[in-house]
């Protein structure tokens, strides 16, 4: 049970080091990243919904991935921006900390489940194109997305519940810009070895449960693409899969550092650097990764801009 320590009711987010002037510069940079992230991912969701050329499983999954990117950055960045404007440390109450950590982990878990599904979708499209529409039909896609969302949110209930049954009596200063799990474990005066081991096993299950199908499917995809006789066909297939692979490398690399370690408090002081990759950089890059290398999306964007210009003229 929670004890009556100040850390059990509120925490102080240490945020970023540096002067007030540096904080204002960082605020401008991250605010720009946040706006571009919101606009870019919203545009992807809109064109996937309205453009008939993008009515396929690949773009259906991409629309949901963009929604998840908006959520994960919105859970973290507004709080971080507010902290950059305030002098000193930022106070966050226990209830807000619980909600933030749960939503962050739940959305992240959902995203990895969806990335695994996207890898399987690309495998079927490249390696079994004649049966693609039969296997990846609308019912299958809706079911996969629903399972990903439900799994992501249900899977993180127990880990977050356990985190806030610990007693935080060492300190209530979190060396991060949000309620980071590794930092919270460092502040606990309980013996957290067993808890950390269970959290490690759960992280391994989520990340490798998604990463292994991704690696296997990409291996099959590459071997299939290399058998395509025309160079233009190979180039087009590689371009389609490269965007997904780029997103996978950034996302998995960051989260493997953050969560796949037996002792969660190990190197926890560097978590804020990698957390920036997950919550700021990856959602920012997502629209560029999936649009600049995709001819269909570029054409849909171009036509959408033309229609908007015509509406304004009229």
Curated annotation (Swiss-Prot):
Cystine bridges: 97-189
Q: Where in the cell is it found?
A: Cell membrane
Topological domain ranges for the Cytoplasmic compartment? 46-53, 121-139, 218-237, 293-314
Q: What is the lineage of its organism?
A: Eukaryota, Metazoa, Chordata, Craniata, Vertebrata
- Protein source organism: Homo sapiens (Human)
Q: What Pfam families would the database entry show? A: 7tm_4
According to the UniProt topology, which residue ranges lie Extracellular? 1-24, 75-99, 161-197, 259-271
One GO cellular component this record assigns the protein to is:
plasma membrane
User: According to Swiss-Prot or TrEMBL, what is its membrane topology?
Assistant: Multi-pass membrane protein
Name the protein family.
Belongs to the G-protein coupled receptor 1 family.
Protein name (database record): Olfactory receptor 9A4
- Known role: Odorant receptor.
Matches recorded under InterPro entries: GPCR_Rhodpsn, GPCR_Rhodpsn_7TM, Olfact_rcpt, Olfact_rcpt_6C-like
Looking up PROSITE patterns in the UniProt record yields: G_PROTEIN_RECEP_F1_1, G_PROTEIN_RECEP_F1_2
For this UniProt record, give its keywords in alphabetical order, as a comma-separated list: Cell membrane, Disulfide bond, G-protein coupled receptor, Glycoprotein, Membrane, Olfaction, Receptor, Sensory transduction, Transducer, Transmembrane, Transmembrane helix
Bilayer-crossing residues are: 25-45, 54-74, 100-120, 140-160, 198-217, 238-258, 272-292
Q: What is its main location?
A: membrane
Sugar attachment sites are 4, 190
List the molecular function annotations (GO) for this entry.
G protein-coupled receptor activity; olfactory receptor activity
């Amino acid at each position: 049970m929670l004890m009556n320590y100040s850390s059990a009711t509120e925490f102080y987010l240490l945020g970023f080091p540096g002067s007030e002037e540096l904080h204002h510069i960082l605020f401008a940079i991250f605010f720009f990243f946040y706006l571009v992230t919101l606009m870019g991912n919203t545009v992807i969701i809109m064109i996937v919904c309205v453009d008939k050329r993008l009515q396929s499983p690949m773009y259906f999954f991409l629309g949901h991935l963009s929604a998840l990117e908006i959520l994960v950055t919105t859970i973290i960045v507004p709080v971080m921006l507010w902290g950059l404007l305030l002098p000193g440390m930022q106070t966050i109450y226990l209830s807000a900390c619980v909600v933030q950590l749960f939503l962050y982990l739940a959305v992240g878990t959902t995203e990895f489940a969806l990335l695994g599904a996207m890898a399987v979708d690309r495998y079927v499209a490249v390696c079994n194109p004649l049966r693609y529409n039969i296997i990846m039909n609308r019912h299958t896609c809706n079911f996969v997305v629903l399972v990903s969302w439900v799994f992501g949110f249900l899977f993180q209930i127990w880990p977050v519940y356990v985190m806030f049954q610990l007693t935080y009596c060492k300190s209530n200063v979190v060396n991060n810009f949000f309620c980071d799990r590794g930092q919270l474990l460092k502040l606990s005066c309980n013996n957290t070895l067993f808890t950390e081991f269970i959290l490690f096993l759960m992280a391994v299950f989520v990340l490798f449960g998604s990463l292994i199908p991704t690696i296997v499917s990409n291996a099959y995809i590459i071997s299939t693409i290399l058998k395509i006789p025309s160079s233009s066909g190979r180039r087009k297939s590689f371009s389609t899969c490269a965007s997904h692979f780029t997103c996978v490398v950034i996302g998995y690399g960051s989260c493997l550092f953050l969560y796949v370690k037996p002792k969660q408090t190990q190197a926890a002081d560097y978590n804020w650097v990698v957390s920036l990759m997950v919550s700021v950089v990856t959602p920012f890059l997502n629209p560029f990764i999936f649009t600049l290398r995709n001819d269909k999306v570029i054409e849909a964007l171009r036509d959408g801009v033309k229609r908007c210009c015509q509406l304004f003229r009229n």
